[in-house]
Swiss-Prot record:
Domain of life: Bacteria
High-level lineage: Bacteria, Pseudomonadati, Pseudomonadota, Gammaproteobacteria, Enterobacterales
This protein's UniProt keywords: ATP-binding, Nucleotide-binding, Transferase
GO biological process, one term: prosthetic group biosynthetic process
Organism: Escherichia coli (strain SMS-3-5 / SECEC)
Keyword Nucleotide-binding: yes
EC numbers: 2.4.2.52
Family stated for the protein in its record: Belongs to the CitG/MdcB family.
InterPro entries linked: CitG, TriPribosyl-deP-CoA_syn_CitG
A GO MF term: triphosphoribosyl-dephospho-CoA synthase activity
Catalytic function, reaction form: 3'-dephospho-CoA + ATP = 2'-(5''-triphospho-alpha-D-ribosyl)-3'-dephospho-CoA + adenine
Purpose of the protein: Catalyzes the formation of 2-(5''-triphosphoribosyl)-3'-dephosphocoenzyme-A, the precursor of the prosthetic group of the holo-acyl carrier protein (gamma chain) of citrate lyase, from ATP and dephospho-CoA.
The protein's name: 2-(5''-triphosphoribosyl)-3'-dephosphocoenzyme-A synthase
PANTHER family, sorted: 2-(5''-TRIPHOSPHORIBOSYL)-3'-DEPHOSPHOCOENZYME-A SYNTHASE, TRIPHOSPHORIBOSYL-DEPHOSPHO-COA SYNTHASE
Length: 292
């Protein structure tokens, strides 16, 4: 399919640099979905609490999305002179086209819609920073992405419309802002919690997969995951947060033997039909930012 026009401005960024960051985005998606065992989520062992998707769907989806990540970076660079609040509207057509390719690759299964939103924002932020010759760090990338999303939660979640979306309903009932709120705030769960936690575990010499699984537990314990709340209500969300925190309090995931606790947690999530997809999206962001 044809690419949406990105901007009338040109970018000075090298294609190799753009492709390098796009490749990291693809690797981040694959790293997350291949990580096993993950409670309630699709992984190499099972399909979690999902009956409509499998591991291969995520692999096809990630490949389809990879081709669009350079477009997000290019738009971020080409729009570097625009007010940050104006950037999001320009990103939407690229995101919608990317989403269309994702659905075609998976025969209609929503595998990575949340990641298109978050990685699209982060890639655009990287493009803007590179174009302006500013440092590309986890903090600058997330703060730039936040500037694109200023006012997003108010605009899209606060409404008096009688026909509420799932996100609007969860916001009104439980105060959950989901992916929009996390992006608008500059991904504080990642920057202040998950990323330093993950990097500290790596510095301590922990196996990277175990470190990532432990970081997933941290996100599950702290994230107001709208995916979980939409399936299990407030009770399901609080149960999942409590169980994840209990595992962390008991030492977390430090050895292969600890994986038995995750397998049991996975079985319980499947029984309750709970899938922490929002936390999985934040784990993708965490791994991605850890590489830059």
């Amino acid at each position: 399919m044809s690419m949406p026009a990105t901007s009338t401005k040109t970018t000075k960024l090298a294609t190799s640099l753009i492709d390098e960051y796009a490749l990291l985005g693809w690797r981040a998606m694959l790293t997350e979905v291949n990580l096993s065992p993950k409670p309630g989520l699709v992984d190499r062992i099972n399909c979690g609490a999902h009956k409509d998707m499998a591991l291969e769907d995520f692999h096809r989806s990630a490949l389809a999305i990879q081709g669009w990540l350079p477009r997000f970076i290019e738009f971020g660079a080409c729009s570097a002179e625009m007010a940050p609040e104006a950037v999001l509207n320009g990103l939407r057509p690229i995101g919608m086209a990317c989403e269309g390719d994702m659905f075609r690759a998976t025969a209609g299964v929503n595998t990575h819609k949340g990641s298109i939103f978050s990685l699209g924002l982060l890639c655009a932020a990287i493009g803007r920073l590179l174009q302006l010759n500013q440092p590309v760090t986890p903090t600058t990338v997330c703060s730039t992405a936040a500037s694109f999303c200023r006012g997003l939660t108010d605009r899209e979640l606060r409404t008096n419309n009688s026909q509420l979306t799932a996100g609007q309903r969860l916001y009104q009932q439980l105060g959950l802002t989901g992916a929009r709120g996390e992006a608008e705030a500059g991904y504080p769960l990642v920057i202040n919690h998950a990323l330093p936690h993950y990097l500290t575990l790596l510095d301590q010499g922990l196996d990277p997969e175990l470190a990532l699984l432990d970081t997933l537990l941290l996100l599950m314990a702290t994230n107001g995951d709208t995916n979980v709340a939409s399936r299990g209500g407030e009770g399901g969300l609080r149960w999942l947060q409590r169980e994840a925190q209990t595992l962390l309090n008991n030492g977390g995931i430090r050895t292969p033997a600890d994986l038995d606790y995750l397998r049991q947690f996975d079985r319980e999530c499947i029984e309750r039909n709970l899938s922490p997809g929002g936390s999985a999206d934040l784990l993708i962001i965490t791994w991605f930012l850890a590489q830059i």
